[in-house]
Curated annotation (Swiss-Prot):
This is Putative cytochrome c-type biogenesis protein CcmH. Residues 1-19 form the signal peptide. NCBIfam families: cytochro_ccmI. It comes from Haemophilus influenzae (strain ATCC 51907 / DSM 11121 / KW20 / Rd). Heme binds at C44, C47.
Length: 459
């Protein structure tokens, strides 16, 4: 008895499974291939997530039959698709045509990018005046100017944040603002009615040809199917009454996006670092005043770092100020940042190549380099300085050190002796230079003895 029930259950499910398979007689393999391709590429209007080949809905069965009928009439695949689109709308295809609503989704991101580019170009700093701001503005004016610039930047950030939020919200929530010409329920009713009359016409044709016997029963079944597919008015109102709240949902989505984006930026964004940089830059006039009393009140390491940061920001806005580049090089030397000093001195010398002070600072950093090419370039710069100023003690000192380093002890001693003649006798550096001269002469004698030994053959 148990085996009999299992057999009947299996037979029941197998009959249900095979009921979805259409028994069709194709005239050619190509026609069969076209049929399967079309049924897999057309979407079921009732199921929406399935194609008509996989759907068992009544409308899907009728659509499969219509596809077969049109192919039997010699229609092409494009003709079949055009027929289905004309009858059921663009929804039945998985590749709908481009419309105004789809263009918005494609063009909006490009417009957002173009808007950002235009904004960046408009923010490009204008050409700075040739007159230095420090000569025409007081410290109070500089402080007020920095405060105004900070307000403008905060206003720009707020406008960008609001604009970006609105554009993203429009792209994401645009469908909520769309006002459809017909409701979903009305479209479905019209589709079911059209299907009902089409099927009724087919039954009448089959009856006139004597292909069916129980015409009334088929009509009653068709009417029952129509009633089952069309829900009651109460259910229709309950299911789709919420569609009138599209604008409310849109506003809620925009607010939610702003609430999420704002705290997220303040948590992980770089606004704190940018704010600190702006505060440091605003202290630049204060650092210039401190330089006047640096001997009595020297800079601390922290203040030196802040001064360096403020100068960098200022040089980004006015990169042609050679004096500030030289000052940044001096700060780099005090901080022990050789790369900062090298780049700053190089920039200052490039902007004003005839300035002896800038050329001397660049030559000094080159002389301290371990690269032979840099040392050679530094020596050439020192000779240029001495040709411009024959009495430049610092240039002579660096050149004498260069001679001593290359074991040219004679020129080192001569250069130091020249420095002695230029310096006052009571100068604190005189004993050190005299000692350097003696060291150079001793090294020269040892060098000459070594040369004489190498020249004189041993007996």
């Amino acid at each position: 008895m148990k085996k009999t029930w299992l057999f009947l259950t299996a037979l029941l499910f197998s009959s249900v499974a095979f009921s979805a398979i259409d028994a069709l007689n194709f005239s050619s393999p190509q026609q069969e291939s076209d049929y399967h391709q079309l049924t897999q590429s057309l979407r079921c209007p009732q199921c929406q997530n399935n194609n008509i080949a996989d759907s068992n809905a009544t409308i899907a069965v009728d659509m499969r039959g219509k596809v077969f009928e049109l192919l039997q009439e010699g229609k092409s695949k494009n003709d079949v698709v055009d027929y289905m689109v004309a009858r059921y709308g663009n929804f039945v295809t998985y590749d709908p045509p481009i419309t105004a609503s789809t263009l918005v989704l494609w063009i909006a991101p490009l417009l957002l990018v173009l808007l950002g580019v235009v904004f960046l170009l408009r923010r490009k700093p204008k050409t700075q005046s040739a007159v230095k701001s420090q000569e025409i503005l007081t410290d109070e004016d500089n402080a007020r100017l920095a405060e105004l610039l900070n307000k403008d930047k905060x206003m720009n950030f707020t406008l960008i944040f609001i604009l970006t939020t609105l554009v993203v919200a429009l792209i994401c929530f645009y469908p909520l603002l769309c006002q459809f010409k017909a409701k979903h329920g009305q479209k479905r009713d019209d589709l079911n009615k059209a299907l009902y009359f089409s099927r009724l016409e087919e039954i009448e044709q089959d009856n006139s040809q004597g292909l069916v016997e129980n015409v009334e029963q088929l009509k009653q079944e068709l009417q029952k199917t129509l009633l089952d597919d069309v829900p009651s008015k109460v259910q229709e109102n309950v299911d789709y009454s919420g569609k009138s709240y599209g604008k409310i949902w849109f506003i809620s989505g925009v607010l939610a996006l702003g609430i999420i984006a704002g705290p997220s930026y303040f948590m992980v964004g770089s606004w704190q670092a940018e704010s600190m940089l702006e505060q440091t830059y605003a202290k630049l006039p204060y650092f210039f005043d401190r330089m006047k009393n640096e001997d009595k009140n020297p800079f601390s390491d922290t203040e030196m770092q802040q001064f360096s940061t403020a100068l960098r920001i200022d040089l980004q806005k006015n990169p042609t100020d050679a004096k500030k580049w030289w000052m940044l090089g001096q700060i780099g030397m005090n901080l022990g940042d050789a790369r900062l000093a090298f780049d700053s001195y190089q920039k200052a010398n490039k902007l004003e190549p005839d300035n002896v002070q800038y050329k001397l600072g660049y030559a000094r950093i080159l002389m301290f380099s371990e690269d032979a090419t840099d040392k050679l370039k530094g020596g050439n710069l020192l000779r240029e300085v001495i040709r411009q100023e024959h009495t430049n003690i610092e240039a002579l000192s660096l050149l004498a050190f260069r001679y001593f380093e290359t074991e040219d002890y004679k020129m080192a001693a001569v250069t130091w002796a020249m420095m002695l003649r230029l310096m006052p006798k009571d100068d604190e550096r005189v004993p050190l230079i005299e000692k350097s001269i003696r060291t150079a002469r001793d090294a020269l004698e040892a060098q000459n003895e070594e040369k004489s030994k190498s020249i004189t053959p041993e007996k």
